[in-house]
């Protein structure tokens, strides 16, 4: 649907008030606009009243029936914000809705993974059907077909909800209750129903605990989870979350956006303002978190004296102050229809409310939130590679819930880090093969958290003079989740909550790194700095680097270029993917497959097997810049001296990887180990030729940290060249991580003066790299390569972009210290010299 059309539907524009251009996009057809109104309203589960669909579709009941059918067919969450309509009007409870969904997918013999994540979690909560239970039910369903008396899927599903968690502050509403229903109720149940009908909605904590559960299981009541403007929400490590698939419907998208943005010091109204999302939608999402048990309220007053005696021994995360009249938390669309508490009006235009919150209650919540002395935090940015390591390694029994939280919520807040650190401490440092990689990342992550979190020495000069310095709290943020927000919203979220961003290194090439001027970012300044372009930039400014060839998408090789003759191993980087080392003997087919859908960087890596790499941490100490070049003092390498003069390494942190292609130290099988980077596949399954070949990863045994093996043999400066430069804190090596953290502290990188210099240097570096990249985009459409028989090429005709980083429009070669355009022959005489860096 057209974005402009959606905007005008969302803001209830009738056809007569639509701008001319919007009408033209609809073919000047009012009927088409009305169709779009109905479709948008159903997809977004909008209430019939007070929305444009009321003027388009006259039958309210039919509209809700269509909405329910669409939601069920698309496996969406039950529309709890429409519970008054769904339960009282259509007699569809959440239990019957999910039982119908489960019946549908069983009859279609779909896998459990077809259920979206949140829908699967709600099914598990109400039906008690998870992955294993579903497989068992499907086996029973299939086996029953072999016998005369066949059982349907419905026969195998539960007849009533499982025991669910109900909080005392939830509101009990009367459902669709007939006289026949009353007859089967016990005396206490009848009393509770009479109280709800006569006195209005009741806090569940004011009723008998067992009666509430009994009435809910019978479908006679439904539960609202009220969220007010001042509600503050905490998200603990996820329990009961089902990792299936992401569907992408409006509410699921909203849930993930709020997940990564929410914190327990920001109330719902402030959060809606930061995200620029309608307040009622944010309340619906937060209410869903609480209902599913993924979040709980903060800052509420517990008054046990007002609770029904049956609730006294019931464990509860939180309880609303029960002296608050639940009727005051409800809103009404008109004089006679009660509105769900989670649908409070979000603007002053909703004048049909029957009450406002008690000012005293609002004040008590506000004072609690203000008295916490909340300060901004440090954010440590990681990617999904880290969460994969924590989940796959089977490192600790309770570590997985934290890893799932880091992946699904996109954030692990400082309040959860104590329990996370306890689980990381349980990880043993012993492992073999690939498992060792998981152990190393877990242990190094723990050290990084301990270093950044509440480190008073780290930020000694950034604290306010009138406040004691305890350092800053730390949140862990997943880059991919932040990128789910639009750039402006992401910037507002980061500015509101954080004083400094620190990235892990290296971030996978498969994501676009977060760019930020404020708060300052110790990490890649712009996406191009974390791309293939930056490698070429480093080689260009230093005049040193391995033989490299960047081929544009669509290029086809007939033979391996001459600059790679004699190399036993090549480092291959497919655009938007992480690099891998492959044998030169059988690389041609894989290269051509990859080039059909991606630009590719080819680099010489090893003459005698895999080349040897050494990681040199920066910023450099004065002692590291003096003396003669040795393996233990690579900081005096000429290339690094030039690099320091062109790139400010004193206010950044990270490491430079040096490569010795002629070393025979690392001549061992590729399969024995793995690289510090994550994804193993270069040629993905989306390859147009259907190739399933993949590039194996750089072996980690070939990588060492500076001074790890200081006496492992003589080495010449000319043997070593820079391979790459990564900004951030590395997690793949504990020794390298320790050195980088130590340098951050000793050089005061997190102090105010250093961060100001960092901001200036980041902008300068960004401009230089962007100019460098831009110089290869001009004239791309007119470039004509005349390949000799050894090479043929089909170039991209425009400098298109992948994930925001421009693709190369020219084939480029780096050889003998010179970056030049490659025409398919021997090195071109046409050098790229007009670079003003």
Swiss-Prot record:
The keyword Phosphoprotein is annotated on this UniProt entry: yes
InterPro entries: FAM91, FAM91_C_dom, FAM91_N_dom
Regions of compositional bias (Polar residues) in chain numbering: 340-366
UniProt feature, compositional bias: Basic and acidic residues: 670-680
Compartments in which it is found: Golgi apparatus, trans-Golgi network; Cytoplasmic vesicle
Annotated GO CC locations: cytoplasmic vesicle; trans-Golgi network
A GO BP annotation: vesicle tethering to Golgi
Keywords: Cytoplasmic vesicle, Golgi apparatus, Phosphoprotein
Coiled-coil regions listed in the entry: none
Subunit structure: Component of the complex WDR11 composed of C17orf75, FAM91A1 and WDR11; FAM91A1 and WDR11 are required for proper location of the complex. Interacts with golgins GOLGA1 and GOLGA4 and with TBC1D23; interaction with golgins may be mediated by TBC1D23 and interaction with TBC1D23 recruits TBC1D23 to AP-1-derived vesicles.
Family (UniProt): Belongs to the FAM91 family.
Primary role: As component of the WDR11 complex acts together with TBC1D23 to facilitate the golgin-mediated capture of vesicles generated using AP-1.
PANTHER family linked to this entry: PROTEIN FAM91A1
Protein name per Swiss-Prot or TrEMBL: Protein FAM91A1
Organism: Mus musculus
């Amino acid at each position: 649907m057209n974005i402009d059309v959606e905007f005008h539907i969302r803001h209830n524009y009738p056809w007569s008030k639509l701008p001319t251009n919007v009408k033209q996009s609809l073919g000047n057809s009012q009927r088409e606009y009305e169709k779009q109104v109905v479709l948008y309203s159903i997809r977004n589960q909008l209430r019939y009243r007070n929305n444009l669909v009321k003027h388009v579709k006259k039958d309210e009941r039919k509209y809700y029936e269509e909405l329910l059918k669409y939601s069920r067919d698309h496996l969406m969450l039950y529309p709890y914000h429409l519970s008054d309509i769904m339960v009282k009007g259509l007699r569809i409870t959440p239990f019957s809705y999910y039982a119908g969904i489960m019946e549908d997918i069983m009859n279609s013999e779909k896998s459990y993974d077809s259920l979206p994540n949140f829908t699967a979690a709600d099914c598990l909560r109400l039906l008690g059907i998870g992955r294993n239970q579903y497989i068992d039910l499907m086996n029973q369903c299939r086996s029953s077909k072999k016998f005369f008396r066949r059982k349907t899927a419905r026969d195998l599903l539960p007849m009533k909800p499982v025991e669910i968690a109900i909080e005392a502050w939830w509101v009990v509403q009367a459902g669709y209750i007939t006289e026949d229903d009353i007859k089967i109720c016990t005396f206490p149940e009848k009393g509770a129903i009479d109280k709800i009908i006569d006195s209005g909605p009741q806090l569940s904590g004011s009723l008998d605990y067992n009666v509430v559960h009994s009435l809910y299981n019978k479908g006679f009541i439904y539960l609202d989870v009220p969220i007010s403007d001042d509600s503050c929400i905490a998200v603990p490590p996820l329990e009961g979350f089902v990792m299936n698939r992401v569907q992408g419907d409006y509410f699921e998208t909203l849930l993930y956006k709020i997940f990564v943005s929410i914190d327990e010091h920001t109330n719902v109204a402030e959060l809606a303002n930061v995200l620029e999302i309608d307040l009622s939608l944010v309340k619906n999402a937060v209410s869903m978190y609480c209902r599913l048990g993924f979040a709980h309220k903060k800052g509420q007053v517990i008054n046990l004296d007002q609770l029904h005696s049956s609730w006294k021994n019931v464990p509860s995360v939180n309880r609303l102050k029960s002296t608050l009249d639940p009727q005051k938390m409800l809103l009404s669309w008109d004089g006679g229809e009660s509105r769900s508490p989670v649908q409070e009006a979000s603007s002053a235009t909703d004048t049909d409310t029957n009450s406002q919150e008690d000012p005293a209650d609002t004040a008590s919540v506000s004072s609690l939130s203000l008295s916490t002395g909340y300060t901004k935090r440090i954010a440590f940015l990681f990617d999904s590679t880290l969460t994969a390591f924590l989940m796959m390694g089977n490192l600790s029994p309770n570590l997985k819930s934290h890893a799932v939280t880091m992946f699904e919520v996109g954030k692990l807040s400082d309040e959860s880090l104590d329990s996370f650190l306890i689980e990381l401490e349980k990880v043993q440092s012993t492992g073999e093969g690939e498992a060792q990689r998981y152990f190393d990342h877990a242990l190094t992550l723990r050290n990084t958290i301990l270093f950044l979190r509440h480190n008073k020495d780290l930020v000694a000069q950034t604290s306010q003079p009138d406040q004691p310095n305890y350092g800053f709290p730390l949140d862990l943020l997943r880059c991919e989740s932040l990128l789910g927000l639009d750039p402006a919203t992401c910037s507002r979220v980061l500015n509101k909550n954080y004083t400094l961003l620190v990235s892990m290194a290296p971030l996978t090439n498969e994501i676009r790194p977060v760019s930020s001027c404020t708060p300052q970012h110790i990490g890649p300044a712009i996406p191009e700095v974390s791309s293939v372009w930056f490698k070429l930039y480093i080689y260009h400014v230093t005049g040193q680097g391995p033989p490299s060839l960047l081929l544009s998408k669509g290029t086809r090789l007939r033979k391996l270029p001459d600059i790679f003759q004699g190399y036993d191993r090549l480092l291959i980087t497919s655009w938007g993917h992480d690099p891998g080392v492959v044998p030169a003997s059988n690389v041609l087919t894989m290269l051509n497959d990859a080039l059909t859908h991606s630009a590719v960087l080819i680099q010489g890596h090893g003459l005698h097997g895999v080349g040897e790499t050494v990681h040199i941490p920066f910023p450099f100490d004065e002692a590291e810049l003096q003396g003669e070049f040795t393996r233990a003092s690579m900081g005096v390498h000429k290339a690094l001296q030039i690099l320091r003069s062109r790139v400010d390494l004193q206010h950044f942190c990270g490491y430079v990887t040096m490569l010795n292609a002629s070393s025979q130290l690392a001549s061992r099988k590729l399969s024995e180990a793995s690289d510090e980077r994550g994804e193993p596949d270069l040629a993905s399954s989306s390859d147009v030729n259907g190739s399933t070949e993949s590039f194996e990863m750089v072996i980690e045994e070939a990588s060492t940290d500076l001074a790890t093996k200081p006496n492992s043999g003589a080495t010449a400066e000319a043997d070593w060249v820079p391979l790459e430069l990564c900004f951030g804190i590395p997690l793949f090596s504990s020794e390298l991580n320790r050195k980088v953290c130590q340098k951050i502290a000793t050089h005061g990188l997190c102090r105010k003066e250093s961060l100001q210099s960092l901001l200036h240097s980041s902008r300068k570096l960004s401009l230089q790299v962007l100019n460098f990249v831009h110089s290869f985009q001009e004239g791309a459409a007119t470039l004509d390569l005349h390949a000799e028989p050894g090479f043929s090429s089909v170039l991209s005709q425009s400098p298109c972009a992948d994930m925001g980083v421009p693709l190369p429009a020219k084939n480029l070669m780096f050889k003998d210290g010179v970056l030049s355009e490659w025409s398919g022959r021997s090195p071109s005489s046409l050098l790229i010299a007009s670079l003003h860096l």
